[in-house]
A protein has these predicted regions:
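Short hydrophobic/aromatic-rich beta-strand segments that constitute the beta-sheet cores
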Residues: 114, 135-140, 157, 205
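N-terminal subdomain of lithium-sensitive/metallo-dependent phosphomonoesterases centered on the IMPase/IPPase/PAP
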Residues: 1-90
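Residue-level signal for inorganic ion chemistry
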Residues: 25, 48, 59, 93, ...
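Short amphipathic beta-strand/extended segments with alternating polar/hydrophobic composition
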Residues: 128-131, 141-152
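DPxDG-like acidic metal-binding loop motif
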Residues: 79-136
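An extended, acidic
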Residues: 148-266
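Short coil/turn connectors at secondary-structure junctions
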Residues: 64, 81-82, 112, 152, ...
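Conserved residues at the C-terminal ends of beta-strands
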Residues: 71, 117, 209
Length: 266
């Protein structure tokens, strides 16, 4: 298996790593798990830690010269490496800890391929993938292109703190905006799986406050996926995401993005 990982392209490595993490997440679901306090009300479970170890095993075997930034383990791997993988082994830990299956496993090569695994999507989970140019959902060996659409009218809004954009922007205020109520229906899943759903046409958009999220272990895979699928991706200020970025607005199409920005800017 290790030799076969080394022969994969970057998208294949991302898929293999995300699936390895998703396997652990499924296996440990519903068990009593120890919690590791991270401060500020945040915590990791033994599932987070075990899933990250499984992901790192794949990445180290397949790309030993690359560096890794993990949500739980921090920076690891080759010092001075030009390539860096961003890993969030269990996005939605709070959901998972109380028995909710709304979680994702995120693996992204910074500026390249990425995979977002839904451990509980379908019989054996599904993986949303990009090679940096194309985007598809993979079930087993079957692939289906991702086609975003704003037709659902469903918009995921992240209401988890912190809220650095306040008081200028408050996500909760968007939900009460009369134009939002007339055009969209809010959803709050508290996991970046929602980004994959925008790329797949299951959501019209995703909105979150924040700073520069382009290099975040939580968001990098979903952002890469949405860009490759043809979504419109900006900060909450309408500007490109990056070092000076503010939060994230990902919309299935330009018109959905325009409508949301008109409400956010008011």
């Amino acid at each position: 298996m290790i030799n076969s990982w080394a022969g994969l392209d970057d998208a294949g490595v991302a898929v293999a790593a995300a699936r390895a993490g998703a396997d652990v997440v499924r296996e440990l679901f519903g068990r009593r798990l120890e919690r590791v306090d991270k401060g500020g009300g945040d915590f990791a479970t033994t599932a987070d830690l075990a899933a990250e170890r499984a992901i790192l095993e794949v990445l180290r075997a397949a790309r030993p010269g690359d560096a890794v930034l993990g949500e739980e383990g921090g920076r690891q791997g080759a010092v001075g490496a030009e390539r860096r993988w961003l890993v969030d082994p269990l996005c939605g830990t709070l959901n998972y800890a109380v028995g909710s299956r709304l979680v994702a496993v995120n693996v992204a090569l910074h500026g390249g391929a990425a995979a977002v695994a839904d451990p509980f999507g379908g019989e054996a989970g599904e993986v949303f993938v990009t090679d940096g140019t194309h985007a598809w959902v993979q079930r087993g060996e079957d692939r289906e292109p991702l086609v975003p659409t704003g037709g659902t009218g469903l918009v995921d809004v992240n209401l988890d703190p912190p809220f650095p954009g306040a008081p200028g922007f408050r996500a909760v205020d968007l939900l009460a905006h009369p134009d939002f109520v007339a055009r969209f229906r809010p959803r709050v899943v508290s996991t970046t799986l929602a980004l994959a759903w925008v790329a797949a046409g299951k959501r019209a958009a995703y909105v979150t406050d924040g700073g520069d999220l382009s290099g975040s272990v939580h968001f990098a895979a979903g952002i890469a996926l949405c860009r490759a699928a043809g979504c419109t991706v900006t900060g909450i200020d309408g500007e490109p995401i990056g070092p000076a970025g503010r939060g994230l607005v990902v919309a299935a199409d330009a018109e959905t993005h325009r409508q949301l920005m008109s409400m956010i800017r008011r």
